[in-house]
């Protein structure tokens, strides 16, 4: 481990925002009793929360603890929620919008073209497509909006 690579306050902040934030939002929607029958609760997440992806695509690089841990926790929260609300007639989807050209990914600007990074408007269209296409049969699935395939845990 490199010296001074961990900032525990920052790691906790990321977990609070990226893992608990979507859970808070979904909880508020459910508690409001304003959701229609068949409502879809969508969590925008990242393949960075996939342990399998992390051990293959970025093998031997480590780092970004807060980001990866917060996304894995976010995905687990959504999976648990999907089981809990299935009986209420709601589905829960976890969607990775793909590699988007944003301020958050700017540090990877040198590989945007190589890795196929897209404008966020393209990522948003991909997300909408998956939301429209998927429903109760896919509840609890972790889906890559780039190709529609399920992302392994």
Q: Which residues does each PLM region occupy?
A:
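Short connector loops/turns at beta-strand edges and beta->alpha or beta->beta junctions
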Residues: 47-49, 98-102
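Soluble or luminal CAZymes and related metallo-dependent hydrolases
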Residues: 21, 73, 119-123
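C-terminal helical subdomain
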Residues: 94, 102, 106, 110-153
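Conserved Rossmann-fold SDR core element
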Residues: 75-81, 85-100, 137-142
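Catalytic loop of short-chain dehydrogenase/reductase
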Residues: 1-17, 23-24, 30-86
